[in-house]
């Protein structure tokens, strides 16, 4: 029996090693050893970045896997670079190498206002102890995933378990309806959307992310599933509440006290100004990757034009900001503070009468 058990064990290990050295039938691409290590030992050296074993037999963590320089050829999105990324005026130019979320490089270099201070990348913000616009419930430093992060399940404290089933069961070809983590936009649990296959490396009006937004009639509507509702988990009063965005019952028809989000520009009182979005006339305007808008259309048909169907000109947080970071104050997409002497006025894409 002992010899039989030993042979069975040997065959099991051999089978596992064969799996790890060959193609792995998962949604992630490449061989399994690109991400996993069986024993954290190879040729008398440890395999993991830290030297210690990681959860789920991973070679690295979120930051380690997503640190590098985007070239347009890499299949894994890099959101942090150890060298200055190429951003240019808006981060969308042909000579830029950042993605839709921007890059953590600047905030990791000690520039607090240039991005989110994620644990492991940047020190806690020297000025802000709580997220601006927050209700005080989020206490502690932001992480990539888990209960203190943006990605994965908010019910899991640890980052790796929070992403369980995400990478292996992701199907990028379908509308991400938020019903499961694997079916959530960019592993942002419950958030809907349709992602560009190259993560907006050199985006155009014909190739970009499709962000989900909701045209609200009241700020009490939390707009579940929208990309802006994700931001509102930490920055609540910039998105929803009571008299936080517009006083009383005048949401969309009266005076704003904070910039609206999850609101369709076609419903604005001065809608004629916004009908000129990105140089258009109010019908079939070209989509802007510099100042993008969200849509309520939940299909894989890309929104290459705006003012084409109902609720397709929805202002969102990402119309102005990069989620990870940028070289500009407040993680803005463009250098508004340098305008008009220099920089780019992305505000003018929507506010056409004020440029």
Residue ranges: model-predicted function:
Residues 16-24:
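C-terminal segment of classical bacterial N-terminal signal peptides
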Residues 1-10:
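Bacterial N-terminal signal peptides that target proteins for export
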Residues 5, 24-25:
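N-terminal leader/presequence-like segments
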Residues 27-355:
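A motif-centric signal for short, conserved binding hotspots located
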